[in-house]
Amino acid sequence: MNTSPKTLKTIAILGQPNVGKSSLFNRLARERIAITSDFAGTTRDINKRKIALNGHEVELLDTGGMAKDALLSKEIKALNLKAAQMSDLILYVVDGKSIPSDEDIKLFREVFKINPNCFLVINKIDNDKEKERAYAFSSFGTPKSFNISVSHNRGISALIDAVLNALNLNQIIEQDLDADILESLETPNNALEETKEEEIIQVGIIGRVNVGKSSLLNALTKKERSLVSSVAGTTIDPIDETILIGDQKICFVDTAGIRHRGKILGIEKYALERTQKALEKSHIALLVLDVSTPFVELDEKISSLADKHSLGIILILNKWDIRYAPYEEIMATLKRKFRFLEYAPVITTSCLKARHIDEIKHKIIEVYECFSKRIPTSLLNSVISQATQKHPLPSDGGKLVKVYYATQFATKPPQISLIMNRPKALHFSYKRYLINTLRKEFNFLGTPLILNAKDKKSAQQN
């Protein structure tokens, strides 16, 4: 075990009650030492323990919650601030499922003032779709933030690596390793910017009743698990099926068909709720449209579910062999009625005859790669700079509107922040222009692109 040549490095875990401090302490210590519960303020004393992080011995402190209205709050706060002052690094934990409060921001900045070597740890970000919530914590004004889920063990390894780097402990172990071992540990030059987690692509099949969703599922999986019938609404519970394409697992969910709201009764209301929950876990939606008859208003409303859940999307035109009109007419109508999905790929098929099924499978993987894409920061800023030079931002009542820089803060879907002097002055039409520019420059096939404007002061404060 490696230790610092001097005294042990000390890490203090601070934050308000019930945000997961003790759970993180237990996770890092790999033992259930601190009491954890849903009751705010279970930790009152400072728990101290020597632990090993990737072979390095450090001292970990778990402190009592710093809530303003807590019993003994003054004493606890004083103790916490003393711990912050004496520590080499602070992990300030917040609840990612809650809205940041002014009190929490004030406490964080007070701690940061005492010890700037401080990480903002956003807990309870249980899956990729919840990362957008973490963006709200940019108001804390620190670039040193980490999204984790202690209960799901997500983001813990990245946090530990950052902790060791901040404490200059990784350098110590590297000096002790043989050069050949170090070479074998190095990341190849052509590796992705982010470590790619082994993940199953979750695909929701959506559409109104009797458009052929179950037939599509059967064709994709080559099974007959999903009941196919001419009777509308034979699928009630979402049905999961997993297939393997190369080394990539894809899980399909055949959701219940959606009717007009006025026709939703009894068990179909339950089915609609299950459909919504299934989409919450999905990465990509296959929107199945029946082209044996003209599109209806409900098709457009259902397509909005993909936008609501920020999903990648592929349009599946089923029953193409008995289409109601020529190709050109259908495509023109599709473009007019679904203009907000102009980035979505379109595939024609006849599910019962299993036409173009392999194309759908490979398109899912292609869209998922776009959905997971991260643009290098330098390249992103180069494109944004060129776009603003080509078409300058409109002024705000005669005052200059400027983009300082851009950064992609999340994937699945890609989410980009523009750090500006007047974020509220960014007009919707100019935002759309920038999004279209990014789509043209980078391949975001079938992928929603989220662009937010933030104030420089709130987004980046040392």
From Swiss-Prot:
Binding positions for GTP 1 per the UniProt entry: 15-22, 62-66, 123-126
Keywords for this entry? GTP-binding, Nucleotide-binding, Repeat, Ribosome biogenesis
Enumerate the SUPFAM superfamilies for this protein: P-loop containing nucleoside triphosphate hydrolases
The terms under GO molecular function for this entry are:
GTP binding; ribosome binding
Q: Which residues form the EngA-type G domain?
A: 9-171, 201-372
Q: Taking every annotated instance into account, which residue ranges of this chain make up the domain KH-like?
A: 373-457
- Please tell me whether the keyword tRNA processing is annotated for this protein: no
Q: Which residues bind GTP 2?
A: 207-214, 254-258, 318-321
Any single GO BP term? ribosome biogenesis
Function according to Swiss-Prot or TrEMBL: GTPase that plays an essential role in the late steps of ribosome biogenesis.
Q: How does it assemble?
A: Associates with the 50S ribosomal subunit.
- According to its UniProt record, which protein family does this protein belong to? Belongs to the TRAFAC class TrmE-Era-EngA-EngB-Septin-like GTPase superfamily. EngA (Der) GTPase family.
Q: What is this protein called?
A: GTPase Der
Q: Which organism is it from?
A: Helicobacter pylori (strain P12)
